[in-house]
Structures are given as C-alpha cells and as structure tokens.
Amino acid sequence: MSSYMEAAAAARAAEAKTEGLLRGACALLAAAAALLVGLNTQTETVLFIRKKATVKDVQALWVLAMAAAAAAGYHLLQLLRCFYLSRFADGKPCRHRRAIAWLCFLLDKGCAYITFATTVAAAQACVVALYGTHALQWTKLCNIYTRFCEQVAGSLVCAMLAAVGTALLSVVSARNLFRLYPSMLSPPPSSFVG
C-alpha cells in the first residue's frame, strides 16, 4: 500500500512540475508578445512629413498588448501557486480544494479565450495593414513601416503560442478539477475482473 501512495505522490509531483513548466513558458511567451508589440515604434518620412507608427495607432494591437500583459501576470501568479503547492502544502488537506479548482479552471478558460480572441483580432488588423483595403482607400502600411510590421508579426507568433499553451493549461485545470469528483460508475462485476 505504501508503494502505491509513493507512486501516486511522485505522479502528482511530476504533474505539478509539468504544469509549472507550461505556465512558465506561457508567461514568457505572453510577456514577450506584450513587450514586442507594446514597445514597438518606427518613424519614417512620408511625403516630406515625419510619421511615427506606434501601437496606439491600431486599437487591436493596443488591446493585444494589454491582454498579453495581463495573461503573463496571471500565469506568473499561477506559477507561484504551483510552486507553493508543490513545496509547502504537499499532502496537507485543503478545505476549499473544489472551490479553488473551479476558480483556476474558469480563470484558465477565460485567459485562453481572451488571449486567442485578441491575437486573432490583432492579426486581422495586421492583414489590413499588410495588404490594404482598396474599397476603403486604405493603403498598404507594411511597405512603409517594415520593421514595425516585422515586430508585430513576431509578437503575434508569441501571442498565438501563448494562447495554445493556455488552452493546454485549461485542459490540465479541467483534469485537476474533475479528478476531485468521484466516479458515478459502479465497479464492474467480479466475473469481469478476472
């Protein structure tokens, strides 16, 4: 019986370590996306006028920067929670385990949806900047602000990877949540056990 408990404890520790690594990667990717797009500026001369491209020129990019920064902060807090639970609260029962698991599950889902939605909205705005919209007489901007567009593309890649990682973390949260509920299935009859 003790070998089973030791194996279960080792499995929980490995799962916590994997979740921590994934949360750390998501935090780094989201922070990189926020910094790449948030600190990005480029000044060019267009028809004898100096124009400066910033993240605030495109509302979707500004929202992406704020959402990615919030996601990075959230993942950092969850990483600290994972660290605390794996180091200091190992084996101690918690009265509010289900409530905490539900909260983590819902926050992970919300973070995944928001990160994905803002990344896709920013990508759509970037497609307009890349190709222009002739019906609205919007010209291409990426041939003028090349470095700005390249950095935005890099931030979109980081943000999309963070969104995929956050979706994986929501699966982990769902597993951790529903593990707390007992199975409703009855055990198989003894004739099937063999």
Curated annotation (Swiss-Prot):
Extracellular-facing ranges: 40-59, 131-151
Phylogenetic placement of the source organism: Eukaryota, Viridiplantae, Streptophyta, Embryophyta, Tracheophyta
Name of the protein this chain belongs to: CASP-like protein 2C1
GO terms under cellular component: plasma membrane
Cytoplasmic topology ranges: 1-18, 81-109, 173-194
Family of the protein in this entry: Belongs to the Casparian strip membrane proteins (CASP) family.
InterPro entries per record: CASP/CASPL, CASP_dom
Topology relative to the membrane: Multi-pass membrane protein
Pfam families, per the entry: CASP_dom
Organism of this sequence: Oryza sativa subsp. japonica
Subunit structure: Homodimer and heterodimers.
Parts of the chain that traverse the membrane: 19-39, 60-80, 110-130, 152-172
Compartments, record wording: Cell membrane
Keywords for this protein: Cell membrane, Membrane, Transmembrane, Transmembrane helix
